[in-house]
Swiss-Prot record:
Residues 107-117 have a biased composition (Low complexity). This is Dehydrin Rab16B. Keywords: Stress response. The keyword Cell division does not apply. It comes from Oryza sativa subsp. japonica. Belongs to the plant dehydrin family. Disulfide bonds: none annotated. PANTHER family: DEHYDRIN RAB16B (PTHR33346:SF57), DEHYDRIN XERO 2-RELATED (PTHR33346). GO terms for biological process: cold acclimation; response to abscisic acid; response to water deprivation. Residues 25-53 have a biased composition (Gly residues). Residues 1-136, 145-164 are annotated as: Disordered. Pfam families: Dehydrin (PF00257). Residues 147-164 have a biased composition (Basic and acidic residues).
Length: 164
């Protein structure tokens, strides 16, 4: 008869601390320990009747008091990028990972070269329009063609005097 009753003579319809019904499979329900007490060996792993035969939950709740704790690291990678047509498109996970890897921005060099070519800046400059030397002031006119794409070295060679 002891197998059909729960702890302290109550019926077998028990609930946990959250109000969820506890079946016989979760805490060991109807089986009794070989010592004869109420301490059943179940999922919790707390066997023995040393604590008055009460079942102890296997996990502990960690409460933070309603405060969200954040780590000190910050990562700001935008989730969208320019699609080349004046609009935006969402980046895939592959692009985000490549963006974070050192030296993995090979796909972005093409965009940067197009922008740098229109401003007349060289590698390492911040796109200054005025350059020292015998420039004509129309540096970006050659790169306006969409049909002809020039490599990075070709752009540098064009800027050197006497190579035309």
């Amino acid at each position: 008869m002891d197998n059909y009753q729960g702890q302290h003579g109550y019926g077998a319809d028990r609930v946990d601390v959250y109000g969820n019904p506890v079946g016989a499979g979760q805490y060991g329900g109807g089986a009794t320990a070989p010592g004869g007490g109420h301490g059943a060996m179940g999922m919790g792993g707390h066997a023995g009747a040393g604590a008055g035969g009460q079942f102890q939950p296997a996990r502990e709740d960690h409460k933070t008091g309603g405060i969200l704790h954040r780590s000190g690291s910050s990562s700001s990678s935008s989730s969208s990028e320019d699609d080349g047509m004046g609009g935006r498109r969402k980046k895939g996970i592959k692009e985000k990972i490549k963006e974070k890897l050192p030296g993995g921005n090979k796909g972005n060099n093409h965009q940067q070269q197009q922008m740098m070519g229109n401003t007349g800046g060289a590698y390492g400059q911040q796109g200054h329009a005025g350059m020292t030397g015998a420039g004509t002031g129309v540096h970006g006119a050659e790169y306006g063609n969409a049909g002809e794409k020039k490599g990075f070295m070709d752009k540098i060679k064009e800027k050197l005097p006497g190579q035309h």
